[in-house]
Each structure stands twice: as structure tokens, then as C-alpha cells.
Amino acid sequence: MTATKLHKKVILVGDGAVGSSYAFALVNQGIAQELGIIEIPQLFEKAVGDALDLSHALPFTSPKKIYAAKYEDCADADLVVITAGAPQKPGETRLDLVGKNLAINKSIVTQVVESGFNGIFLVAANPVDVLTYSTWKFSGFPKERVIGSGTSLDSARFRQALAEKLNVDARSVHAYIMGEHGDSEFAVWSHANIAGVNLEEFLKDEENVQEAELVELFEGVRDAAYTIINKKGATYYGIAVALARITKAILDDENAVLPLSVFQEGQYGVNNIFIGQPAIVGAHGIVRPVNIPLNDAEQQKMKASADELQAIIDEAWKNPEFQEASKN
């Protein structure tokens, strides 16, 4: 995709709670000129209904072609967004979903590639770091053109939690969650800042904020998905808007720095997996990772998170079906 392209096309694979919320976010924000929605055959009519429903919002936003799509419609798409997968149930971790969702991912990616698609993959199905890796393996695409939503939502949750604790606008909070999008993620406290002021320095004027409260704050961020799932069954609004933000950065060639699931080539001593860290993203995918200098404790947490993901991938790739389908 070139930065000057006027007609930008997105194909969404998966019209569940996350997918339909993402489609609504795209319409609301006027992102892309064409949106196709792919669903499994037995849910095709739902995609037709959602496309029709969304089209009725267009007079309030901006023109867009919206329709229930088939895999052949991916051929000239700029971006394919994968939200399809088995949902995370109460009591399940994201990593519990590996077996079910790898098989689904393989089927999706194979059909997208067979269409002649030559754009960028954006993966949001969980466990997202593992499924971003499998999308790369099954597609044979360059690593720069396979992106996972990574810790984009986690970092937003972190910023919002800090903003509420410190009574400032979340847009003035600059802080990242890195590592797995899941239980082994960690907060990069050493580089958190409020409008350029290091968090530790900022807290000197916040006498009522104790260190124990910050530990509790991070735990709330890390466990937010479980809290929401237990209360309403699924998380979808936050991740939908995160995906819309990533989509805009790609389609508008923003070269924005966002926390994404990015291929590792030695940064932080990690290799050959996708894991959450900030990266510059634009029209051609990942421009380059942004390697925040971690302190020793954070570095250890990054390595531990990567080791956990690597163990899951190694176990999954013992399956001959996945080995045979791998192109990278």
C-alpha cells in the first residue's frame, strides 16, 4: 500500500463481539473507504445484517462501502484484520485457547493468502502473540507485514488507571505495558511519565499515593480482562478502539509509535517470537521496533514472558499439521 492511495480497503475476519465492535469503530471514525466482513458460512447472514446495520450510520459519518465478504475479496485489500477465534471463557487464560485457535487461524490465513492478498495482517484473536506468530508462519509473509495488537489495550488500561489515580488526562500519561498480552505482562515503570515528567519525580508532589497502591494498580490492569469477562462475558470495546487506532496508523502511513506484538530479532535477548513492545507502524507495516532501555528487573520480566510464549509455541509446533503448513 502506498501512502498516497485514496481508496483504502479493510477485510475483517470474524464478526463476533470484537469484530463487530471494531467495524462500528471504523464507521464511527471514518476510517477506510471499504470494509468487507467475513464470517463462517453458518453465520454469513449475521455478517449481511451487520453490514446493513452499519451502512445506516454512514449518513452521520463518511461514505464507505460495507458488505458481507468472501475470502476472494481479500485479493486487493490493504489490511486483513483477524478477530475470529474461540472466545475466552470465565476461568480460562488466553494461553488456554492455543489449541482451538491455532487450527482456526491456520484455516483463515491459508484462505486469505490463496486469494492473492498482498497487504498487511493485523491479528487480535487470543492468545494474540502466539497467533501473530502462527499467522507469520502460515502466510510466509515478511515479519514487517504481520502485526499483533499486542499490549496496545494493556497499555491503554495502564494509562487510564494512572490517569484516574493521579487525576490527570490519560492523554498526558505516557506509559507502556510490555511482554505477553496476558498473565506474564509487566509495566515499564522506569519510563512512565506524566507530560514528560518521570513518574517517580511526579509522585513527589502526590503525597497520598503509596507504592503498594501502584502495585495494586498494575495488578488491576493485568487482570482487567478477567474482571470484565466475569462481569459481562467478554471484552470488546477497548480492543475494538485499539484496533481502529492501529488501522488508522497503517492506512494513513502515520509512522505512529504503538505497543504491538512485534517480531524479535535479539532485542531484549529474545529471538524468533512475537511479543509486545513499542514499534513504529505505517503503510508498509512495522517500520522498526522502538527498544525502550529496560532496567534489570524489567529485563528479567521480559525474558520470563518471552520464555513462556516460546514454550507454548514449541509445544504447539509438535503438531505435524502446523509444521507442514509453515512457510516461514
Swiss-Prot record:
Active site: H181 (proton acceptor)
GO process annotations (BP): glycolytic process; lactate metabolic process
Keywords linked to the UniProt accession: Allosteric enzyme, Cytoplasm, NAD, Oxidoreductase, Phosphoprotein
Known regulation of activity: Allosterically activated by fructose 1,6-bisphosphate (FBP).
Residues binding NAD(+), per UniProt: V18, E39, K46, Y71, G85, A86, S107, A124, A125, N126, S149
One Gene Ontology term of the molecular function aspect: L-lactate dehydrogenase activity
Modified residues (Phosphotyrosine): Y226
Xref: InterPro entries: L-lactate/malate_DH, L-lactate_DH, L-lactate_DH_AS, Lactate/malate_DH_C, Lactate/malate_DH_N, Lactate_DH/Glyco_Ohase_4_C, NAD(P)-bd_dom_sf
Listed pathway(s): Fermentation; pyruvate fermentation to lactate; (S)-lactate from pyruvate: step 1/1
Complex and partners: Homotetramer.
Family: Belongs to the LDH/MDH superfamily. LDH family.
NCBIfam families: L-LDH-NAD, PRK00066.1
Protein name: L-lactate dehydrogenase
Source organism of the structure: Streptococcus thermophilus (strain ATCC BAA-250 / LMG 18311)
Upper lineage: Bacteria, Bacillati, Bacillota, Bacilli, Lactobacillales
